[in-house]
């Protein structure tokens, strides 16, 4: 069941306990960021807040974010992640610099490939609000295994976000604790570099085909062999 929380003016967090989505309500339309797992009834949760027409934009194409797309049929998603989406969905491109205005928010699209090749963040510079999808988290785990992920790109994207950190006040990840501060960008980066350099001990995940790496701040599910 999705729990809906009004976090700021016109800004709602829709959370099923495993992943969260974000709904912004304006005067004439609403904006939904991500759609959750398949079968989560995200449309019902949105309709409980507003009856406005809804546009959908995506932080990335993983199943736990794109699973509710059939309830809407259309979204904006970075082209690099189109192959992750199945079903009869009308996909429109999403790229660096695309801006979405709704309900007093101005969300700028920032490409941050790594967690997936098509990962993006949405950033409201005036409010200092960053919606990074899965790419910035407190503790983790951050998934970095599989053919649609790239650790080198993830590291470069974290560096890109670090350049914005002075203006960021609030980060709301799609998983685990929220809100968090901009210091977690640097913490995730520090541990990602350590993982790349082979400095983190790893243990086999008991259920998934990956290795669990635990850094100083962040846990990653990555490639490689257990140490």
Describe every region a protein language model picked out.
Residues 37-108, 138, 191-198:
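Active-site HxH/HxHxD metal-binding segment of metal-dependent hydrolases
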Residues 1-48, 121-133:
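Conserved beta-strand hairpin/beta-sheet module of binuclear metal-dependent hydrolase folds
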Residues 143-158:
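A short alpha/beta connector and helix-capping loop motif
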Residues 34-37, 60-61, 105, 115-116, ...:
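Active-site metal-binding loops of divalent metal-dependent hydrolases
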Residues 159-227:
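Accessory terminal helices/loops
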Residues 112:
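Conserved SAM-binding loop
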Residues 28, 51-53, 168:
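A general structural motif
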Residues 42-45, 154-157, 161:
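A general structural detector for well-ordered alpha-helical segments in enzyme core domains, enriched
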């Amino acid at each position: 069941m999705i729990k809906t929380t009004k976090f700021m003016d016109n800004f709602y967090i829709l959370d099923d306990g495993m992943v969260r989505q974000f709904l912004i309500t304006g005067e004439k339309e609403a904006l939904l960021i991500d759609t959750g797992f398949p079968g989560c009834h995200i449309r019902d949760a949105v309709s409980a807040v507003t009856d406005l027409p809804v546009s959908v934009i995506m932080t990335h194409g993983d199943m736990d974010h794109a699973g509710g797309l059939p309830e809407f049929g259309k979204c904006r998603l970075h082209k690099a992640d189109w192959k992750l989406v199945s079903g009869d969905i009308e996909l429109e491109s999403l790229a660096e610099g695309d801006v979405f205005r709704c309900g007093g928010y101005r969300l700028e699209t920032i490409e941050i490939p790594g967690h997936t090749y098509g990962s993006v963040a949405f950033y409201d510079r005036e409010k200092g609000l960053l919606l990074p999808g899965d790419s910035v988290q407190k503790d983790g785990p951050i998934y970095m295994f599989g053919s649609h992920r790239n650790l080198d790109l993830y590291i470069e994207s974290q560096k890109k976000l670090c350049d914005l950190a002075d203006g960021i006040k609030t980060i709301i990840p799609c998983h685990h604790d929220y809100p968090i501060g901009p210091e977690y960008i640097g913490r995730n980066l520090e541990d990602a570099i350590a993982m790349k350099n082979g400095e983190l001990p790893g243990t086999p995940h008991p259920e998934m085909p990956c290795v669990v790496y635990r850094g100083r701040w962040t846990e990653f599910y990555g490639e490689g062999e257990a140490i």
